[in-house]
Amino acid sequence: MAQFEWVHAAWLALAIVLEIVANVFLKFSDGFRCKIFGLLSLAAVLAAFSALSQAVKGIDLSVAYALWGGFGIAATLAAGWILFGQRLNRKGWIGLVLLLAGMIMVKLA
């Protein structure tokens, strides 16, 4: 594995942002009834995976994927709350805390 460089972290951050954008577009697509948002969602997912592929050139795949997925879920939850008024119940919050704890454990391992 190549030595870590900040450019790889930037690629990972871009992948996370693109995943969030894809999820928001997917919600706006209303089950692909609004085709433009559905297509934008697919394009954002492809771009997110492309950015992730660049990130793993300098970050271990297990770490990059865990961070990408974890931050993507947490930020999508925030976007759902802000944009759509969606709320988590107690079990959802427990799951989010466990997810964040798992991300920390992977990073520290």
From Swiss-Prot:
Recorded superkingdom: Bacteria
Task: Give yes or no: UniProt keyword ATP-binding.
Answer: no
- GO MF annotations for this entry? amino-acid betaine transmembrane transporter activity; antiporter activity; choline transmembrane transporter activity; spermidine transmembrane transporter activity
A single Gene Ontology CC annotation of this entry is: plasma membrane
**Membrane-protein topology:** Multi-pass membrane protein
Intracellular or extracellular location(s): Cell inner membrane
Q: Name one GO biological process term.
A: glycine betaine transport
Transmembrane ranges, per UniProt, are 6-26, 36-56, 64-84, 88-108
UniProt entry keywords in alphabetical sequence: Cell inner membrane, Cell membrane, Membrane, Transmembrane, Transmembrane helix, Transport
Query: Is Transmembrane helix among the key words of this record?
Result: yes
Q: Which Pfam families match?
A: Multi_Drug_Res (PF00893)
Hey, which family's this protein in? Belongs to the drug/metabolite transporter (DMT) superfamily. Small multidrug resistance (SMR) (TC 2.A.7.1) family. MdtI subfamily.
The record's section on NCBIfam families has: PRK10650.1 (NF007934)
Subunit info here reads: Forms a complex with MdtJ.
Function field: Catalyzes the excretion of spermidine.
Query: Which PANTHER family does the annotation name?
Result: SMR FAMILY PROTON-DEPENDENT DRUG EFFLUX TRANSPORTER SUGE, SPERMIDINE EXPORT PROTEIN MDTI
Q: What is this protein called?
A: Spermidine export protein MdtI
**Gene source species:** Escherichia coli O81 (strain ED1a)
Gene that codes for this? mdtI
